[in-house]
Each structure stands twice: as structure tokens, then as C-alpha cells.
Design a protein with these regions (language model features):
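Carbohydrate-interacting/catalytic domains
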Residues: 1-9, 13-218
């Protein structure tokens, strides 16, 4: 659901119907293919998580663009439409043995409506069996990164705050400032969104000083 194009979801995936691991069940007219609707209740937490993921995708047009990304700053925003990152910002470890990657979408290349730009989004994919740290690119002045999704919390996969407009995070949680190195647990995915700092906060003042210095980590 965070990839461009049509989401590759088959009926039942949203509530954990696995077909017992059979990836080619077209000829299985039996329990392998029959949807077990009891799983909706049994896996209600996962079902709710998928619903939030769908809502998040819908509210962020940068995640489903009609045209291919150029990876260039062709509008002079100071950021390309799409960029790749890793343990260092603006640099992807493309070695064949690497199992992690950071992807940043600049929401200014997409509109939520005629006037409002979409958000900056950073997606950290760690498919390795070990935890890794990702270096976060600096955001424009007056903004900070806030974690909105983590598939490896103590409670399991979570959205915070809920993407569909549910209860917002507490004021204390919203003020948590993620900077420089961002740890991602093994075999997990995290999503960060660029949020505006409150006027007069220390971060907002720091951001004004950094304006115009080009690409960097915070």
C-alpha cells in the first residue's frame, strides 16, 4: 500500500487469510481457497491496521501518482520528487546484500486539493534480520519528522495518530523530535511524516537558521 501503482492485494489478505502458504490456489476448490470470514474477528487488530493503511494511502496523493517520478528537483523546491536513503542521508546502499532502504517523497509535488500540498513522507524498509539505523534528511525550516506508523512496536503494528482521523497523539508525543539517526527494528517498516513545528518553538527557530544550506541531515 505504500508502493506506487495498483496495490497488489487479494481478497482475504486484509484479515490474514493465508491460503496455508499456497501461492497458486486457482484449482483448489477446498479450504485452501475458501475465505474463512471468522478471521475478521480473530485478526481484528490486523484488519484495523490494514484499514488505517488504506486510509493513509488515500489521504496522501504522493503515494499514488499518475506519472513516473523523475528523482529530480524540477520545480525548484530544494528537494527531488523522490529520493533514496540509507545509513547516510541521500545515499542508498545498493549492494546486492543490502536488505534495507529509505524512501522519501516530497509532497510538494502532489496536491491534496487545489491549494494544500501533500506531506513529506519518509518510508524506512528494513527486511534484514538485524536492526538498523537510518539517517533522516533535513526538512524545510519549521518542520520536523514524526513517526506515524511502526510495524514493530511492543503492541504489534501500529498507526499513531490514526490515519483515518481518529484520536490524535498526545501533545507530549507530538513534541517528540526525531533527528539524525532513526532506529528501525529487524524485519519491519516505519513511516515518518513531516509535521509543522509550533510557532516560537526551539526547533522552528533552529529551522530558520538552516534555511538555504542545501541537503543535509538535521
Amino acid at each position: 500500500l505504500t508502493a506506487q501503482g495498483t496495490p497488489m492485494i487479494l481478497g482475504g489478505d486484509e484479515f490474514g487469510f493465508s491460503r496455508k502458504g499456497n501461492n497458486n490456489p486457482y484449482c483448489q476448490d477446498n479450504e485452501v481457497s475458501w475465505l474463512d470470514w471468522r478471521l475478521v474477528e480473530r485478526n481484528k487488530d490486523f484488519y484495523a491496521f490494514v484499514k488505517e493503511a488504506i486510509a493513509f494511502r488515500k489521504r496522501h496523493p504522493i503515494l499514488h501518482q499518475e506519472k513516473e517520478f523523475t528523482m529530480l528537483d524540477y520545480r525548484g523546491y530544494g528537494y527531488p520528487d523522490l529520493s533514496y536513503h540509507g545509513k547516510d542521508a541521500w545515499r542508498l546502499d545498493a549492494d546486492r546484500l543490502s536488505r534495507q532502504a529509505g524512501v522519501m517523497y516530497c509532497g510538494r509535488y502532489a496536491k491534496k486539493d487545489r491549494e494544500e500540498d501533500d506531506s513529506f513522507l519518509y518510508l524506512a524498509y528494513n527486511m534484514h534480520w538485524e536492526a538498523h539505523e537510518f539517517a533522516l534528511p533535513a526538512l524545510p525550516a519549521g518542520m520536523k519528522w514524526q513517526e506515524v506508523c511502526n510495524t514493530a512496536t511492543a503492541a504489534g503494528a501500529e498507526w499513531f495518530p490514526p490515519a483515518s482521523g481518529g484520536q490524535m497523539a498526545s501533545e507530549e508525543e507530538q513534541e517528540t523530535d526525531i533527528r539524525r539517526k532513526y532506529p528501525v527494528r529487524e524485519r519491519s517498516i516505519c513511516i515518518l511524516e513531516g509535521m509543522a513545528l509550533e510557532k516560537g518553538s526551539k526547533g522552528a527557530k533552529r529551522g530558520r537558521k538552516n534555511r538555504g544550506r542545501g541537503r543535509k541531515t538535521e
